[in-house]
Amino acid sequence: MSFEVFEKLEAKVQQAIDTITLLQMEIEELKEKNNQLNQEVQQAASNREGLLRENEQLKHEQEAWQERLRALLGKMNEVN
């Protein structure tokens, strides 16, 4: 009788060990996925910063061209 109890206990312990092993593997996979996603987030943030700088530069260029155009139109009005 005690041998059967021991076998059942051993089977439960083995099942627990197998479950823990699978969970550890899943944790490692999730950690790797998390690291990958963090890298993607950092890359996206870096890209965003670059695009914001480029957008500001383009806005300044647009303002400069608008000023030039206004000046040119003003000169044309003076001629007429």
Curated annotation (Swiss-Prot):
What's a BP term from Gene Ontology annotated to this protein? division septum assembly
Q: Where in the cell is it found?
A: Cytoplasm
Q: What is its main location?
A: cytoplasm
Q: Identify the Pfam families for this entry.
A: ZapB (PF06005)
Q: Which family does it belong to?
A: Belongs to the ZapB family.
Protein task: Non-essential, abundant cell division factor that is required for proper Z-ring formation. It is recruited early to the divisome by direct interaction with FtsZ, stimulating Z-ring assembly and thereby promoting cell division earlier in the cell cycle. Its recruitment to the Z-ring requires functional FtsA or ZipA.
Name of this protein = Cell division protein ZapB
Taxonomic source organism: Edwardsiella ictaluri (strain 93-146)
- Taxonomic lineage of this organism? Bacteria, Pseudomonadati, Pseudomonadota, Gammaproteobacteria, Enterobacterales
Tell me the gene name.
Answer: zapB
